[in-house]
Amino acid sequence: MDGIIEQKSMLVHSKISDAGKRNGLINTRNLMAESRDGLVSVYPAPQYQSHRVGASTVPASLDSSRSEPVQQLLDPNTLQQSVESRYRPNIILYSEGVLRSWGDGVTTDCCETTFIEDRSPTKDSLEYPDGKFIDLSADDIKIHTLSYDVEEEEEFQELESDYSSDTESEDNFLMMPPRDHLGLSVFSMLCCFWPLGIAAFYLSHETNKAVAKGDLHQASTSSRRALFLAVLSITIGTGVYVGVAVALIAYLSKNNHL
């Protein structure tokens, strides 16, 4: 009875190990580690160390019963070394044929990633959402450009030049000494209302004296006063002359009527 149970357990473990080999993955559900001598339990607990496991050392068909399975005791000292030597953590590399057989055998337990080269669109082609490419020639590629003239810079330069010329003229005017208006004062004194003309002539002399002393403020004040008095003298004189002429004409016309 014990022999039948052991044979059934051996068959179950061999099927599980064959499935693990076919899948190419480490079977974490299998609690037995396969070594060269047979199946060894991987339980580290001491209560499982006395359990015996039987396995066949030479592969044979199921119907042949020439030899009984060789039974061996579990050696806890060699257990860790045998497991580490067989299932060492490392990068596992498989050939393309093995991967293809895995994909054909079990499609739900593993997946395959395929890299396809030369699928990137070239510089003269466009890719559509459906994965198709369309080639573009040099004549089909058109770049729409927009050009316009910039005239604001020239206008800004013109305004800047005008502003600079105005500022230079103002600076030159401020740096110029005040004028004495001597000729206008003499004309107003001799030909127009002479009292205001004499005052304008006097202020023109005061302007020249202030300029000679370097007192530009006093010189400008005297110059403005001289100009004002000269213009006022000419205005009053012109009015006097016009009034005298009108009175003379009226008097002569009155005498002619008499």
UniProtKB/Swiss-Prot annotation:
| UniProt GO MF annotations | glutamate receptor binding; protein homodimerization activity
Q: Supply the alphabetized keyword list.
A: Cell membrane, Cell projection, Endosome, Membrane, Phosphoprotein, Postsynaptic cell membrane, Signal-anchor, Synapse, Transmembrane, Transmembrane helix
What are the transmembrane regions?
182-202
Q: Which GO terms describe its biological process?
A: intracellular protein transport; positive regulation of synapse assembly; synaptic vesicle clustering
- The chain residues annotated with the modification Phosphoserine are 137
Q: What is its main location?
A: membrane
Q: How does it sit in the membrane?
A: Single-pass type II membrane protein
Q: Which N-terminal stretch is annotated as signal sequence?
A: none
Q: Where in the cell is it found?
A: Cell membrane; Early endosome membrane; Postsynaptic density membrane; Synapse
Query: Which stretches of this protein does UniProt put in the Cytoplasmic compartment?
Result: 1-181
InterPro entries given in the database record: CD225/Dispanin_fam
Q: Which residues lie within the membrane without crossing it?
A: 229-249
Source domain of life is Eukaryota
Q: Name one GO cellular component term.
A: dendritic spine
Q: Which residues lie on this side of the membrane: Extracellular?
A: 203-228, 250-258
Family note: Belongs to the CD225/Dispanin family.
Complexes and interactors: Homodimer. Interacts with GRIA1 and GRIA2.
Q: What does this protein do?
A: May regulate AMPA receptor content at nascent synapses, and have a role in postsynaptic development and maturation.
Q: PANTHER family this protein is in?
A: SYNAPSE DIFFERENTIATION-INDUCING GENE PROTEIN 1, UPF0338 PROTEIN
Protein name per the record? Synapse differentiation-inducing gene protein 1
Source organism per UniProt: Macaca fascicularis
